[in-house]
């Protein structure tokens, strides 16, 4: 590996905010990849996707697990991105390449798409315990929150940061602000969500706000006081509709995995608010073709 490129790559990683330990790991993988390329008469600047698959096959032959290979590919993606930024390459050949079949350690029983939608459509807003105006308003709010869990895959902490100004009903969208561990994103609302939000803003929210003691912020989309218990209370209700429901994290994980069946990794990364693509890759759990089958069937190598 060219010493000058190695130094610039290190500087690039430092600027990106990686720790010293991570930088060493990424640089080491870049050096090893350069050595492999040199032995085969190519270079990281010139290698194509098909040859990158040969490198993956090489790593597999060295006894690396699928999880380890994916970690190494994550480092190489950073390296290729750097080469593109520095105009050494025009593309990142492994931008969306992952080894499927690696099982993420999941403690959730994932919900199907139908089960997710049933949580929303089955949620009662008319028949509520202690039938009074406030409880009916609270039930309507709760159904909106269920919709944001099921359709937009929001994290529990996302709800705390939502303000009235983030709801863009004229555009049919919701802006979710960034947090320390997540990126901001703008997500589309379903038509029926927009209708419910219109009623919520004009009628429901004002009633609920009057019941909140010491509200954190008068512009909160979902008003709360000293503690935010809305989601934990709501999950208990959802368990009555489907005993498989365990947590908001389980619902979010299910939503993200269904997104991955429809969209590419980068799109799902944005929708989920993940800061790093590797966070999105962890949700890939499909038992698809083995690496060997993928290479032979789709990219024949002599």
Task: Give the positions of each predicted feature.
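Conserved catalytic core of the tyrosine transesterase superfamily
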Residues: 1-302
């Amino acid at each position: 590996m060219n010493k000058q490129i190695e130094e610039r790559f290190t500087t690039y990683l430092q600027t990106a905010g990686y720790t010293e330990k991570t930088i060493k790991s990424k640089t080491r993988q870049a050096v090893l990849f350069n050595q492999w390329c040199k032995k085969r008469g190519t270079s990281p600047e010139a290698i194509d996707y098909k040859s990158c698959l040969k490198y993956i096959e090489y790593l597999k032959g060295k006894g690396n697990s699928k999880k380890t290979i994916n970690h190494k590919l994550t480092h190489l993606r950073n390296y290729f991105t750097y080469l593109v930024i520095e105009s050494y390459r025009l593309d990142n050949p492994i931008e969306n390449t992952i080894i499927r079949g690696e099982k993420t350690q999941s403690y959730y029983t994932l919900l199907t798409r139908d089960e997710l939608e049933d949580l929303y459509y089955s949620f009662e807003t008319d028949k509520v315990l202690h039938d009074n105006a406030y409880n009916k308003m609270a039930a309507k709010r709760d159904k909106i929150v269920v919709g944001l869990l099921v359709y937009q895959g929001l994290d529990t902490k996302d709800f705390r940061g939502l303000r009235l100004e983030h709801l863009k009903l004229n555009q049919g969208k919701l802006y979710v602000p960034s947090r320390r561990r997540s990126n901001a994103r703008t997500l589309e609302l379903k038509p029926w969500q927009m209708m419910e939000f219109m009623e919520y803003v004009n009628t429901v929210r004002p009633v609920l706000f009057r019941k909140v003691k010491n509200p954190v912020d008068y512009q909160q989309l979902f008003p709360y006081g000293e503690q935010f218990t809305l989601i934990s209370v709501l999950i208990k209700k959802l368990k009555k509709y489907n005993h498989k429901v365990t947590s908001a994290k389980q619902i979010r994980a299910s939503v993200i995995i269904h997104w991955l069946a429809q969209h590419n990794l980068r799109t799902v990364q944005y929708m989920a608010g993940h800061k790093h693509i590797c966070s999105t890759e962890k949700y890939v759990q499909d038992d698809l073709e083995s690496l060997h089958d993928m290479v032979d069937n789709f990219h024949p190598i002599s």
